[in-house]
Amino acid sequence: MSDDFELDTDDLKRRMDGAMANLKTEFASLRTGRASGSMLEPIQVEAYGQMTPINQIGTVNVPEPRMVTINVWDKSMVGKVEKAIRESGLGINPQLNGTIIMLPIPELNEERRRELTKVAGQYAEHARVAIRNVRRDGMDQIKKAKADGISEDDQKFWEAEVQELTDKMIKVVDAALETKQAEIMQV
């Protein structure tokens, strides 16, 4: 039988890091009352027959703490960009000035801040679930190797490795959530 089982923990870590990267992208899309170019990243605009991110249609700048500007390169795209922002659900009212779209970021009220912290919590839970799914995949590989004949000591060693990696990544998610919630609640 096989006693030389080697679990690819680098692959598990890479997949868990992918869940974390996805969480950071989702967190960036949450409006905190502070202007940020990354808040526009999830918004796609119908441009030249395909959906395109705003940063590929114009230059996104943050000239003031509560203002984002987009200098649209193609004048014919200004209306489409404005429409995409209005329909994005960010609660931002674009103002046009030629090919420049100005996005004043209003202050968040207490109720909206609480809603956003709940949404951030949901995003974090999705990341935790994704990390646990990777853990389950790793544990399944270990069980399969156990059936193929690895020793019980090796099985316990690899299970502990996978669990340690999982616990570490869950702590990273929790810390990111705590930071994001504090940022959202800051007035």
From Swiss-Prot:
GO terms for cellular component: cytosol. It is found in: Cytoplasm. It holds the Pfam family RRF. Signal peptide: none annotated. CDD domains: RRF. Keywords: Cytoplasm, Protein biosynthesis. One of its GO terms (molecular function) is ribosomal large subunit binding. Belongs to the RRF family. Responsible for the release of ribosomes from messenger RNA at the termination of protein biosynthesis. May increase the efficiency of translation by recycling ribosomes from one round of translation to another. HAMAP family: RRF. This is Ribosome-recycling factor. The gene is frr.
